Design a protein with these regions (language model features):
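N-terminal beta1-alpha1 cap of cysteine-dependent amidohydrolase-like domains
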Residues: 1-85, 92-99, 103-160
Length: 162
């Protein structure tokens, strides 16, 4: 059973996780087998070296908490998983960049193409996206929207997945 630490959960930033019987939620990052960074508000543009955009709505307190959790997990060698905002956060903190605003994308259902040729139907509930051409060497692009925009990335090693 995996011990999962949900970053920023203790201050109310994440929704309850579905219990599958394969993981246990822990509240001490030092006890975690994996750190989860979930969806939510926009990433502060200063984290990926851009000015604040017109449509950007951030949670500076959450960013502060999650950057500290990222730094701890990286130092301790704890694998990290990023979903939606979490993937964007890991990309920014690993030196990549984001498209700060993509018009007509929030609330949009679209296909995602995968590196093995599969096609998935996904919902996009955000307007920020990872820039797949501003490569983070530790990440491999696994899936992208038809535009193409990054949808799924994985760490090349065993310590970071988004």
């Amino acid at each position: 059973m995996y011990k999962v630490y949900a970053s920023a959960d203790y201050v109310g930033y994440t929704q309850p996780l579905l219990d599958t019987g394969k993981w246990q939620l822990v509240y001490d990052i030092g006890q975690a087998d994996v750190v989860l960074f979930a969806g939510g508000a926009d990433i502060q543009p200063m984290l990926y070296k851009q000015p604040m955009g017109r449509y950007t709505y951030c949670s500076p307190r959450r960013d502060q908490i999650e950057v500290a959790d990222y730094n701890y997990a990286k130092m301790a060698g704890i694998p990290m998983v990023g979903v939606c905002r979490g993937m964007q956060l890991l990309t920014a903190l690993e030196g990549g960049s984001l498209f700060q605003h993509v018009d007509n994308h929030a609330g949009y259902r679209h296909e995602m193409l995968t590196d093995d040729g599969s096609i998935l139907l996904v919902n996009s509930l955000h307007h920020q996206m990872c820039n797949p051409w501003d490569g983070v060497e530790e990440f491999k692009l696994l899936g992208w929207a038809p535009e193409p925009l990054a949808g799924t990335i994985i760490g090349a090693g065993d310590k970071a997945v988004a």
